[in-house]
Amino acid sequence: MEKMNITDQAHDAFVKAHPQGDLLQLTQWAETKTLTGWYSRRIAVGEDDEIVGVAQLLFKKVPKLPYTLCYISRGFVTDYSNKLALETLLEAAMQIAKEEKAYAIKIDPDVEVDKGADALSNLRALGFKHKGFKEGLSKDYIQPRMTMITPIEKTDVALIQSFERRNRSKVRLALKRGTTVERSNREGLKTFANLMQITGERDGFLTRDISYFENIYDALHPDGDAELFLVKLEPKPVLEDLRQELHELEDEKAKLADKKQDKKTLNKINDADNKIAKTQELIDEMVTLESTHPEGIYLSGALLMFAGKKSYYLYGASSNEYRNFLPNHHMQFAMMQYAREHGATSYDFGGTDNNPDKDSDHYGLWTFKKVWGTYLSEKIGEFDYVLNAPLYQIIENIKPKLTKAKIKLSRKLKK
C-alpha cells in the first residue's frame, strides 16, 4: 500500500462509487467552504495502481494562533476493515496536517453503528480518540451523527406507500392541489434566498446571504451534483381544476338530493356541503391571487445534492402564504422522483436526534423527517487524532463555553 497522486476527477469518481463516499468528500464541496475560511488538500492510497482509499482534508486557522484544525468531513473514504489502508491514509494525512500546522485531525466517517465494529476497533488501535455516541444533533459534533434516509429505489406508488399514513394523504392532496415543481437555474436563487429569509424570520434562525447558495450552485451544478427546485402556484390552471371539482361536487349533491333522505344519505350530503365550502374557499383565494399575481407566486424551494447513488435534501425554504396548498409535500416527492430518475437509491433528509422529547428544540425536525418512509442512519461519530496535545486540551476546554454562547444566541433569535 502506498500514497498515490490522482486527479480531482479520479478522486470524485472513487467517492461517488464507494459505499462510504459522501457529498462532503467531493472536490467541489471544498470550493464551497472557502467563503467560511476553509481550504483543502487531498490524499489517495492504493496498490498496483488501483485506488483503495481517498480523503479530502479541510483546514481552518485557529484564531490568533499559527495553527489549524484538519477536518476530514465524512472521511476517510475506504473500507474500514482494511487496517493497512487506514494506516496508510493516516500516515498521508499526518504528513500534510503537520505541514499545515494542524493541532489535530478530526474525522467523522459515513459508517453506521450496526456495521461499524471494525471501524471503531481499527481507528482506536491507530490512536484515534472517539468522541462518544451522543445525540445526533449534539453541539459537540460538526456534522450530525444521525440522519434520516428514505430508500427511493421503488415505484411512485410504492414510494408513497412507504410514507406514514397521514403523510401519504397529504402528498396525494398536494399533487391534486395544482402547484408546479420547477427544476430552476442560477437566476432562481434570488427567489430561493428570499424564501429562505422568510423562513428564517418565521422559525427564528440566521439565514445565509445569496452568495453562499450561489457558491454551492456554481461549484456543484456543472457536474449535476446540485439542483435548485422551486414550487410555484399559478392561479389560472388551478382555478380551472377547482371549478371543475366544484361542478362535480354540486352534481354529486344533486344526485344525493334525489335519493331517500335516510341517515346515510344525509351524512353524505353534509360531507358534500363541507367539500363544496372548502373548494369555494380555495376558488376565492385563487381569484384574489389572479388579480394580484396573475403569473403566480413561488411558495417553496430547496437544494437537492448528489454524490453517486446518494441524494441529499440540503436546504429548504417556504413562504408563509398558501400553506394549505402543501407545496413542501409536492416538492419533496418531486425531488425524490428526480433523484431516483438520476441514479440515486437514497434520499437523505439530514440531521436529527433519535425520538427526542416533545419539549426538545429538535422535536419538530424529528416529526417532519420520520413521516417520509425514513430510517435512522446512526453513524459511529467523530474521532480526533491529536498532534499537539497541549493546544488540543486548551481548545477542548474552551469549546463548551463557545457552544453555550451559540445556544443562548439561537434561543434569543427564536423569541
From Swiss-Prot:
EC number(s) per entry: 2.3.2.16
UniProt KW Cell wall biogenesis/degradation keyword: yes
Source organism superkingdom: Bacteria
Lineage: Bacteria, Bacillati, Bacillota, Bacilli, Bacillales
Function, as annotated: Catalyzes the incorporation of amino acid(s) into the interchain peptide bridge of peptidoglycan, using aminoacyl-tRNA as amino acid donor.
Disulfide bonds: none
GO molecular function, one term: aminoacyltransferase activity
UniProt signal peptide: none
Protein's name according to its UniProt entry: Lipid II:glycine glycyltransferase
BP-aspect Gene Ontology terms: cell wall organization; peptidoglycan biosynthetic process; regulation of cell shape
Entry's family note: Belongs to the FemABX family.
Recorded catalytic activity of this chain's protein: beta-D-GlcNAc-(1->4)-Mur2Ac(oyl-L-Ala-D-isoglutaminyl-L-Lys-D-Ala-D-Ala)-di-trans,octa-cis-undecaprenyl diphosphate + glycyl-tRNA(Gly) = beta-D-GlcNAc-(1->4)-Mur2Ac(oyl-L-Ala-D-isoglutaminyl-L-Lys-(N(6)-Gly)-D-Ala-D-Ala)-di-trans,octa-cis-undecaprenyl diphosphate + tRNA(Gly) + H(+)
Primary site of residence: cytoplasm
Compartments in which it is found: Cytoplasm
Keywords: Acyltransferase, Cell shape, Cell wall biogenesis/degradation, Cytoplasm, Peptidoglycan synthesis, Transferase
Gene3D superfamilies: 1.20.58.90, 3.40.630.30
GO CC terms: cytoplasm
